[in-house]
Amino acid sequence: MLDSSLAQEIAAIDGVELDSKVTFADLTTLRIGGKPRSAVRCQTTEALVSAIKLLDDASLPLLIVGGGSNLVVADGDLDVIAVIIETDDVSINLTDGLLTADAGAVWDDVVHLSVDAGLGGIECLSGIPGSAGATPVQNVGAYGTEVSDVLTRVQLLDRTTHQVSWVDASELDLSYRYSNLKFTNRAVVLAIELQLLTDGLSAPLRFGELGRRLAISEAEPHPRRPVRMVRDAVLELRRAKGMVVEHTDHDTWSAGSFFTNPIVDPALADAVFEKVGEPTMPRFPAGDGKEKLSAAWLIERAGFKKGHPGAGAKASLSTKHTLALTNRGDARASDLVALAKEIRDGVLETFGVTLVPEPVWIGISIDD
């Protein structure tokens, strides 16, 4: 619990609510995790800034939580204050295509609003769980689109000075599933600004699974489709893989894609190809002379099938998609760690490729 005087001071902030009952299992899409010392719910940006400043001044350990879709949290009582971002304003300028979203806005709601407004650029990111503020931190991406493609700037709270400022996207070192905000607590994302297209069409699409669904030909140089058509197709694909959160479907009790697609030297990619001998092995240029392989493909070829290790397991691969590690109803963090370690080590032993987990680990790690 918070010191009584500090608790009173924080509770007096307009737009703040103290919550002594919530657990991280309540706050994460994996539905795993123990209880924080206390939780502070912030409904406005001003409340969020004020609450964090008071807690930082008291030198208390904080965990900033948005949609909870990218967190693996340890079981038991945790010595941390959960600061829950519940800001949700979204504004759209239809003339210039600028969209601004509070950090706590549900990401898929942001995408839905952009599509309803006829704006293109993030329709391929439909159905991704979590909040808007998390998208630049890990440079969220899917189906050939990344947030970095449209991100212009982010509003940050500097936790050293507690000053608020807008920072250009070029200062975030954005790359595949990475920004310089990812592994640091120095700043909190308060809002994001996106530059979207205003002609009602999607960003250029690449040929592949989504392209086939949209009847795109490999001969089309820069294929585009109406944004609503693309969103609908993406949601169909994600639902078929259990990658759209449904409270009654344990295949969606996950952190989404658990491992990033590995970026490797061409020699290692060649070695994997020679070992498996499949002409259709997915491999893509990744810049700087590297290649990107499919983590899901590697997991399957290493012998891990959908639903592994089978019925009765507390944590298993999704029955719809091998890249999602799921809670089958009453899994603990230790169950998920054991499964993640088994998958990672199995792929390494089979192919010499090390899979890197995408979620942020709190109080536990894959090496525990």
From Swiss-Prot:
EC number: 1.3.1.98
Domain FAD-binding PCMH-type span(s) in chain numbering: 32-199
Top-level taxon in the UniProt lineage: Bacteria
SUPFAM superfamilies the UniProt entry points to: FAD-binding/transporter-associated domain-like, Uridine diphospho-N-Acetylenolpyruvylglucosamine reductase, MurB, C-terminal domain
An example molecular function term from Gene Ontology annotations: UDP-N-acetylmuramate dehydrogenase activity
Primary localisation category: cytoplasm
InterPro entries: FAD-bd_PCMH, FAD-bd_PCMH-like_sf, FAD-bd_PCMH_sub1, FAD-bd_PCMH_sub2, MurB, MurB_C, MurB_C_sf, Oxid_FAD_bind_N
Keywords from the UniProt entry: Cell cycle, Cell division, Cell shape, Cell wall biogenesis/degradation, Cytoplasm, FAD, Flavoprotein, NADP, Oxidoreductase, Peptidoglycan synthesis
NCBIfam families: PRK13903.1 (NF010478)
Function: Cell wall formation.
HAMAP family in the record: MurB (MF_00037)
UniProt xrefs under PANTHER family: UDP-N-ACETYLENOLPYRUVOYLGLUCOSAMINE REDUCTASE
Protein name: UDP-N-acetylenolpyruvoylglucosamine reductase
Organism of this sequence: Corynebacterium glutamicum (strain R)
